[in-house]
UniProtKB/Swiss-Prot annotation:
Homodimer. Interacts with SufS. One of its GO terms (cellular component) is cytoplasm. The active site is at 51 (cysteine persulfide intermediate). GO terms for biological process: iron-sulfur cluster assembly; sulfur compound metabolic process. The gene is sufE. Pathway: Cofactor biosynthesis; iron-sulfur cluster biosynthesis. The keyword Cytoplasm applies. It is found in: Cytoplasm. Keywords: Cytoplasm. Participates in cysteine desulfuration mediated by SufS. Cysteine desulfuration mobilizes sulfur from L-cysteine to yield L-alanine and constitutes an essential step in sulfur metabolism for biosynthesis of a variety of sulfur-containing biomolecules. Functions as a sulfur acceptor for SufS, by mediating the direct transfer of the sulfur atom from the S-sulfanylcysteine of SufS, an intermediate product of cysteine desulfuration process. Belongs to the SufE family. This is Cysteine desulfuration protein SufE.
């Protein structure tokens, strides 16, 4: 995930955007920076339900106990929102993910009020799925 910024830089970059059109473009750019998801990982086990778009998220624990997230979506904005979530959970253990609340970060970014209801629901579905899977790994 070297191409993605850390949490603080994400927030700085986001607040530097002049308007919501620029912010959406930045979110899309973040999604484009995600590593390609292996075709075999696009399976029902990794599908996130509750999203209008097709979304797949793969979670693996590395040798140091850190959770590594990979994902893909057929929608550019959703893939960008996925990248934002991955940035917020970067370098965390499964237990860290279970206890970390991403919502204050979304509030700092004023993200929730600028998403359509279906995108907000999809974002919540991604977060719930990641936290639920992390709970089984912790």
């Amino acid at each position: 995930m070297a191409a993605l910024p850390d949490k603080e830089k994400l927030l700085r970059n986001f607040t530097r955007c002049a308007n919501w059109e620029e912010k959406y473009l930045y979110i899309i750019e973040l999604g484009q920076r995600l590593a390609e998801l292996n075709p075999q990982d696009r399976n029902p086990q990794n599908t996130i339900h509750g999203c209008q778009s097709q979304v797949w998220i793969v979670m693996r624990r590395n040798a140091n106990g850190i959770i590594e997230l990979q994902g893909d979506s057929d929608a550019a904005i959703v893939k960008g929102l996925m990248a934002v979530v991955f940035i917020l959970y970067h370098q965390m253990t499964a237990q860290d993910i279970v206890h970390f609340d991403v919502r204050p970060w979304f509030e700092k970014m004023a993200l929730a009020q600028h998403l359509t209801p279906s995108r907000s629901q999809g974002l919540e579905a991604m977060i719930r799925a990641i936290r639920a899977k992390a709970a089984t790994l912790s």
